[in-house]
Each structure stands twice: as C-alpha cells, then as structure tokens.
From Swiss-Prot:
The keyword Transport applies. Aquaporins contain two tandem repeats each containing three membrane-spanning domains and a pore-forming loop with the signature motif Asn-Pro-Ala (NPA). This is Aquaporin PIP2-4. InterPro entries: Aquaporin-like (IPR023271), Aquaporin_transptr (IPR034294), MIP (IPR000425), MIP_CS (IPR022357). Water channel required to facilitate the transport of water across cell membrane. May play a role in root water uptake. The gene is PIP2-4. It comes from Oryza sativa subsp. japonica (Rice). Belongs to the MIP/aquaporin (TC 1.A.8) family. PIP (TC 1.A.8.11) subfamily. One of its GO terms (cellular component) is plasma membrane. CDD domains: MIP. A motif (NPA 2) lies at residues 230-232.
Amino acid sequence: MGKEVDVSTLEAGGARDYIDPPPAPLVDVDELGKWSLYRALIAEFVATLLFLYVTVATVIGYKHQTDAAVNGADAACGGVGVLGIAWAFGGMIFILVYCTAGVSGGHINPAVTLGLFLARKVSLVRALLYMAAQCLGAICGVALVKGFQSSLYDRYGGGANELAAGYSTGTGLAAEIIGTFVLVYTVFSATDPKRNARDSHVPVLAPLPIGFAVFMVHLATIPITGTGINPARSLGVAVVYNNNKAWSDQWIFWVGPFIGAAIAALYHQVILRASARGYGSFRSNA
C-alpha cells in the first residue's frame, strides 16, 4: 500500500513529497577514518566471493552433467540448463543485495558502483575501494571453486567469459553494453527516493527486480558472451583460469559494462529525474 501524500502541499507550493539525499562529495578522504567504510568493504568482498562461488560452481556442474563423454548419450538432458544458470546468477544477486544493502548498498559489481558514482551516490574514494574489494572477492570465490573441483574446473573452461564463435567483437561489446544498461537502470529505478517515499514496500522488494534483471539479461546474452555485465566476475575467472582467450576478450567485459553503466546513470539522472535536479555537479562539497 502506498504512503499517503499531502496533496494540498503539492498543489499549493509544488513541494515534493520526498527528499533526494545530498550528492556525495567527489573526494571524501575523511571516509578513510570511518569504520563504516571498512565494514562496507568487507561486505562487498564477502558478497562477491559468495556470488562467484555459487554461480561458477553452477556453470561447471552443468557442463559436467551434460558431458556425453562422461554421462553417456542422455547427458544432454541433464543439468540445470541455461535457464538454471541464469537463475543462479539472478537468484544470488537477489539474496546478496538483500543481505548487504543496509551495510554497503549491495553493489557487488564495479559497473553498478561506477553508475552510482557518476550519479553522485558514492564518493570516488568509496567507489575505487569498492571495486578493489569486489575484484578481490571474485578472485577468491573462483579460487574456491577450483580448489574444490580442480580437474573439472580446468576441463570445462572455468566459467570464463569469452566471445562465442560466430559473433563479432562489436556484437559482443554491444551485448555487454545493453545488458549492463538494463541492470544499472533497474538499480536506479528500484532505489529511487521518489518511489521509496510513495510506496512503503519498495525498499524491501528492491533486490527482487535487480536480481530479476540479472536473470533476464543472462537469458539473452549467455549465447553471445557467456554474460559478463560484471567486470569483477569476468576478471575473477580470467585470473584463476588464466587462459589466453579469456584474457584477450577481457577488455570487452570492462569497456562494455562501464559504458552501459554510464549511459544508464545519465539516462536516469539527467532525463528521467531532470525535474528533481538529482544530477549534481562534480564539484566537491568541501
């Protein structure tokens, strides 16, 4: 049930029934002395570690179960399928965003962090440290999978993001841009203070559309790139798997998501929220 709005106030002075949080300072060195920052970094590290562990293990398990050389002619009918893999990625994002949103904001993705930084939701210091924690967590999560399933991990490609045969580099890049745009646009919409003010259930349900966006994007782009839309996910697998193809395609999974995130931030803040003046300048508040 939506929150009641004071219509008379709106009609009289055109006042808004919600308050936009003040823009984060571009550089906030004072954050380095606050425990809340380090608590958030730990949350991002652990969440990304768990995300990569569960999802990459799901991919490896699916490939093993559908390997005809191991499981016979009926192997193609086994495993969770592409639908199950997409659910693993989307479901884990839903769970982890729900668990960490109150601590770190539940980014779990450098592209999401970049989009929120461009929208002045986080400072440059916090954004860079978040990205470092996410990448380190991803590497550790994939390393756990390899540690538990060493032979299977190497045999089945390590869950690496690579451009599929038959697709051009431009197609792969476009798929990553569009997929990340969908994700980051959903993040902005689900956490919009205007929506939160008018619908009391939105903050609780915000992780659901974000996870569902990840699920839908995976269905569309798994055949093209294996679905990156998360540079930490792609980097973590590339580091542990250490395959030439994974490294040569790595730039696609950084450039594409960062472009998609930037476009989503500009679209939401400059066009959709222009009347709210939600897009602050890049001048420091100091």
